[in-house]
């Protein structure tokens, strides 16, 4: 332990007033029991992997994430408390690069919190609950506590929160401990969205002094409880107005509070970390001392944190791979592997021994981690084997690059070439450079990456200053307005009003002919890209004339607003009434493919293939389906045979027919459906309805929660053809499937190959392995055709 830390620890031991010790299990229990006594509903933590429809988050990073629907739309009054698993390792809240350097930053942490939705309890009750729990239940000395409140921002018309100040006085906090702050005590969800003043409780780790001047300045005085009064909303123009309802959102970092009640200056000295650090010390044959001045101790903290975070993420379904949250999990694992071996001397393939320790530490509160620890450990070993294979091969190339120049800076372009050509991740290159006293030009690396990356135009088009509250009359329910009559679909041409026009990413009054821009309609019939389903396309009409070509549509502002992108064919302006005309052929093809996606998921589960869907992308009469293979160890032949059976099962289901049933119900009712394929996400709690889609009739049919558009009769899918199944990395595979007209086209092509190969007239036989387009041949026919080709020879 460093000199500064020793002094702080000694002072704490001299002046600490806590009368008893709390293990992490005891602290959790006391929190739940206290808020249960205050008539709160106790909820389990939701997954650290957010709902797939929430494209704004890589991981659940705050206790309030799961309550977004309740905050934005529900009128239900509720008192709720929980301890939420969180990971901050990407995006706005990113602690990844700070871990190890101090005694408190973590990527995985738990957030204690209680909430009042729609005035379930008052501002004063929230403050009293917090004070009572800290002082009377945990026994924290009130003389160590300071409170801060919002001091007001005059130019924004936000007054000082004097009500809050008076509440703390009534509770018994002396005036010199009630401190006004501005930015520190105004909470915002983002640039636009819910916001409001907050009050915070701060704890002086040393005590026996006036530490009021150190609040929000010195690390010896730490914030332990934040109470947010969510009463306002900031629109896309920066204007703040009343939300129309009052919510209270409170949060306490679990590990930080644990360090307080266990008399520790460091989160890493609490009993959620000490077993992991002790095992790491055993593997490294080195002692962890808790010093801030030791690079070795910083590595201990990094390894303990990253292994813990990756273990939790994998237990919740994350798969280390090259995209999204899987990329961050892989990055954490590989950083722990590299630093654990290179700096602590841990042997290769020993890091997975930390997984059972993490699982055992958290067994009581998160049994799912313990139950899947064997599977998690296998993933660790597989990932480490793949990592060292890459590093050993690419390290020689790095050594060559490093030897080319004596400069202390390694070119970012050369680092990018190592990544692009040899698969050496930037993080590994940076660590290798540090080991020889060099740095990598990461700015140049990023520039090279952006140059090489073909950024999808669609992905970047929809960055508009739009908030969910900007268009209260907007709705996209008309996307479900279609009927199946006399063997075909009918889509009404819905008339509506243009609410807003955007040009060059900014609000505009109008678009001239040939201008490209964005539109928000009042009652939008176009399906906005969401949940893997591609968007509708089509036209807007006035008096029968096409005035705007819709090229794309996407849901933004947290999925609350559907925005159309396209080209004006004639001048149009805001407030015009227009008629919507979908590309019906495209919509029908997408509906067939989306329903077939559910059918494939069902068939795979029935045959025991894989361990669950990881993602999908649905287009017109074709889709891709990503699934986890879990611990499967199948040969190519075995997997192909299973997929052939899967296709047969799907085709049989389609031939038998049956109508689609779609209902909207509450979360609680949806969770009671026994054969529901998709998990009902805990972050969509009661108050928000879910849409349940059942294909066909009977007990054994595909049933999923889904917001997509679907066919009304299973027979309309016509046919399905599984075209390919390939590996996308460790334990992840991708299936490509065609439906409807696309499936029929590949069947006709395959039929022509069979006719050619079976012809008795040599002049009519023209097919060889080289001139067959195998991408147009279903997987079920590829092996048979290969046999016929061999017989032909």
From Swiss-Prot:
Keywords: Aminoacyl-tRNA synthetase, ATP-binding, Ligase, Metal-binding, Mitochondrion, Nucleotide-binding, Protein biosynthesis, RNA-binding, Transit peptide, tRNA-binding, Zinc. Its EC number is 6.1.1.7. It is an enzyme of class 6 (ligase). The gene is aars-1. Consists of three domains; the N-terminal catalytic domain, the editing domain and the C-terminal C-Ala domain. The editing domain removes incorrectly charged amino acids, while the C-Ala domain, along with tRNA(Ala), serves as a bridge to cooperatively bring together the editing and aminoacylation centers thus stimulating deacylation of misacylated tRNAs. ATP binds at residues 88, 187, 224-226, 253. Pfam families: tRNA-synt_2c, tRNA_SAD. It catalyses: tRNA(Ala) + L-alanine + ATP = L-alanyl-tRNA(Ala) + AMP + diphosphate. Zn(2+) binds at residues 594, 598, 706, 710. GO terms for cellular component: mitochondrion. GO terms for biological process: alanyl-tRNA aminoacylation. This is Alanine--tRNA ligase, mitochondrial. Monomer. Its main location: mitochondrion.
């Amino acid at each position: 332990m460093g000199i500064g830390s020793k002094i702080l620890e000694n002072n704490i031991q001299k002046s600490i007033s806590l009368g008893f010790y709390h293990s992490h299990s005891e602290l959790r229990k006391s929190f739940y029991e206290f808020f249960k006594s205050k008539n709160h509903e106790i909820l389990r933590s939701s997954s650290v992997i957010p709902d797939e429809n929430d494209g704004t988050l890589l991981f659940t990073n705050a206790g309030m994430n799961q309550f977004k629907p309740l905050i934005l739309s529900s009128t239900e009054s509720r008192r709720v408390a929980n301890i939420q698993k969180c990971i901050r390792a990407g995006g706005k809240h990113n602690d990844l690069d700070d871990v190890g350097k101090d005694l408190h930053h973590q990527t995985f942490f738990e957030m204690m919190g209680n909430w009042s939705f729609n005035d379930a309890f008052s501002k004063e009750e929230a403050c009293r609950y917090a004070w009572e729990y800290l002082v009377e239940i945990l026994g924290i000395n009130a003389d160590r506590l300071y409170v801060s409140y919002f001091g007001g921002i005059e130019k924004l018309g936000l007054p000082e929160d004097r009500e809050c100040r008076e509440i703390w006085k009534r509770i018994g906090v002396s005036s010199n401990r009630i401190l006004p702050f501005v930015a520190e005590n105004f909470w915002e969800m983002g640039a636009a969205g819910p916001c409001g003043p907050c009050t915070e409780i701060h704890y002086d780790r040393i005590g026996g002094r006036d530490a009021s001047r150190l609040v929000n300045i010195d690390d010896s005085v730490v914030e332990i409880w934040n109470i947010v009064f969510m009463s306002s909303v900031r629109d896309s123009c920066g204007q703040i107005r009343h939300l129309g309802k009052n919510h209270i959102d409170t949060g306490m970092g679990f590990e930080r509070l644990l360090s307080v009640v266990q008399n520790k200056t460091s989160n890493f000295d609490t009993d959620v970390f000490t077993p992991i650090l002790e095992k790491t010390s055993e593997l490294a044959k080195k002692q962890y001392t808790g010093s801030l001045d030791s690079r070795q101790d910083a590595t201990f903290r990094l390894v303990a944190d990253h292994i813990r975070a990756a273990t939790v993420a994998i237990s919740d379904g994350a798969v280390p791979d090259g995209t999204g949250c899987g990329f961050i999990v892989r990055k954490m694992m590989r950083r722990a592997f590299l630093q654990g071996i290179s700096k602590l001397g841990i042997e290769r393939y020993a890091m997975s021994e930390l997984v059972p320790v993490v699982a055992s530490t958290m067994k009581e509160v998160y049994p799912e981690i313990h139950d899947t620890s064997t599977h998690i450990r296998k993933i660790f070993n597989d990932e480490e084997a793949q990592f060292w294979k890459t590093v050993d091969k690419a390290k020689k190339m790095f050594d060559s690059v490093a030897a080319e120049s004596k400069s202390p800076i390694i070119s970012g372009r050369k680092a990018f070439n190592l990544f692009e050509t040899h698969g050496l991740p930037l993080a590994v290159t940076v660590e290798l450079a540090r080991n020889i006293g060099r740095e990598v030009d990461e700015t140049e690396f990023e520039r090279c990456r952006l140059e090489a990356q073909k950024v999808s135009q669609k992905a970047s088009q929809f960055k508009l200053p739009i908030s969910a509250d900007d268009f209260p009359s907007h709705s996209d329910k008309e996307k479900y307005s279609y009927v199946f009559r006399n063997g075909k679909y009918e889509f009404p041409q819905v008339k509506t009003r243009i609410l807003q026009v955007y040009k060059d990413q900014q609000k505009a009054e109008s678009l001239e002919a040939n201008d490209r821009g964005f539109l928000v309609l009042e009652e939008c019939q176009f399906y906005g890209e969401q949940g893997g389903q591609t968007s509708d396309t089509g036209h807007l009409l006035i008096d029968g004339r096409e005035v705007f070509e819709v090229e794309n549509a996407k849901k933004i502002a947290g999925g609350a607003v559907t925005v159309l992108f396209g080209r004006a064919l004639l001048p149009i302006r805001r407030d015009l009434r227009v008629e919507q005309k979908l590309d019906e052929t495209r919509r029908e093809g997408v509906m067939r493919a989306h329903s077939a996606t559910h059918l494939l998921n069902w068939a795979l589960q029935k045959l025991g293939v894989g361990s669950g869907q990881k993602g999908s992308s649905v287009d017109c009469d074709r889709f891709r389906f990503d699934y986890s293979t879990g611990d499967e160890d199948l040969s190519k032949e075995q997997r192909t045979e299973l997929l052939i059976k899967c296709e047969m099962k799907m085709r049989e289901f389609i031939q038998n027919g049956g109508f689609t049933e779609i209902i909207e119900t509450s979360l609680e009712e949806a969770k009671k459906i026994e054969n529901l394929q998709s998990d009902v996400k805990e972050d969509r709690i009661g108050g928000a309805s879910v849409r349940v889609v059942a294909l066909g009739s009977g007990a054994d049919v595909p049933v999923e929660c889904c917001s997509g558009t679907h066919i009304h009769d299973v027979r309309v899918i016509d046919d399905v053809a599984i075209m390919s199944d390939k590996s996308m990395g460790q334990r992840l595979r991708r299936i490509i499937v065609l439906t409807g007209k696309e499936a029929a086209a590949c069947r006709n092509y395959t039929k022509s190959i069979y006719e050619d190969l079976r012809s008795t007239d040599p002049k009519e036989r023209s097919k060889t392995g080289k001139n067959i387009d195998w991408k147009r041949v279903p997987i079920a026919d590829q092996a048979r055709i290969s046999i016929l080709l061999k017989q032909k020879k």
